[in-house]
């Protein structure tokens, strides 16, 4: 399987690391059992028919394995994969070039597909449904449309904000799956597997400690493993033991629930500066010095999952659990005010 990255700048060391530990087969993919079981059936059926797999929409918080699964889909279907992202496809011509270069059975992976410009998104409709695109030649009175056939392909779209997808685009995906956060025991398995690939030992106790603070996210678990490896190597150790793991986590200011400095800053701001909320995300972003999109896509999902934050029509509100933990006692009364128990994101 050939992997082609298109207009996706990334750190070379990060790419090499991801390639080292990324599973290449469905059997090696840990977690998301119902999702992968269904995909096995869909892929097998498509191969029996000799068809391209239906287009696949993968949604969920970042770092749960959407890109990895897109690569596995291409591998299982015996095709190549071309990787790009919504913001990079700023012109319809860029998308047309990609589509016409695909061969039968190839996978086009578009990350952050919810950020596709409207004109480019509309260009996808006929490609997804009829495997054709219409290209305009010339301009003005002499302009004419030329229809080009493209090879049957599979579009895999990934999004952290499925609610921003338009209905016409969403309806064209034959397969739609959502990723869930991972339980600690599965993250521990991922850490043990990755440590073997990286050539560093890790004790079960250390792996469990790292897994428990990884916010249910494999990408974070692997990142913490890399940092623990750094501490182990500086200590001239070939094994990450419990002491090294704890030193790593303490140095990175990651607490027993996986909250980092920015998580705590967000909650402290809501609880103590805005009296528990509600507060608009734009005001919150200015207060903590972070981008609004980053708060919504990176920090909020886990804070909601952990039971500290609730989204309401009026803004973000701290839950009772958050008030108990983060209140400084300056005017916050956990028995009064617009407080919420832990609630899922809306």
From Swiss-Prot:
Its EC number is 3.6.4.-. Its main location: cytoplasm. DNA binds at residues 311, 316. It is an enzyme of class 3 (hydrolase). Residues 1-182 are annotated as: Large ATPase domain (RuvB-L). It is found in: Cytoplasm. InterPro entries: AAA+_ATPase, AAA_lid_4, DNA_helicase_Holl-junc_RuvB, P-loop_NTPase, RuvB-like_N, RuvB_C, WH-like_DNA-bd_sf, WH_DNA-bd_sf. Signal peptide: none annotated. It catalyses: ATP + H2O = ADP + phosphate + H(+). One of its GO terms (molecular function) is four-way junction DNA binding. ATP binds at residues 21-22, 63, 66-68, 129-131, 172, 182, 219. Residues 256-346 are annotated as: Head domain (RuvB-H). Keywords: ATP-binding, Cytoplasm, DNA damage, DNA recombination, DNA repair, DNA-binding, Hydrolase, Nucleotide-binding. Homohexamer. Forms an RuvA(8)-RuvB(12)-Holliday junction (HJ) complex. HJ DNA is sandwiched between 2 RuvA tetramers; dsDNA enters through RuvA and exits via RuvB. An RuvB hexamer assembles on each DNA strand where it exits the tetramer. Each RuvB hexamer is contacted by two RuvA subunits (via domain III) on 2 adjacent RuvB subunits; this complex drives branch migration. In the full resolvosome a probable DNA-RuvA(4)-RuvB(12)-RuvC(2) complex forms which resolves the HJ. The RuvA-RuvB-RuvC complex processes Holliday junction (HJ) DNA during genetic recombination and DNA repair, while the RuvA-RuvB complex plays an important role in the rescue of blocked DNA replication forks via replication fork reversal (RFR). RuvA specifically binds to HJ cruciform DNA, conferring on it an open structure. The RuvB hexamer acts as an ATP-dependent pump, pulling dsDNA into and through the RuvAB complex. RuvB forms 2 homohexamers on either side of HJ DNA bound by 1 or 2 RuvA tetramers; 4 subunits per hexamer contact DNA at a time. This is Holliday junction branch migration complex subunit RuvB. It comes from Chlorobium phaeobacteroides (strain DSM 266 / SMG 266 / 2430). The gene is ruvB.
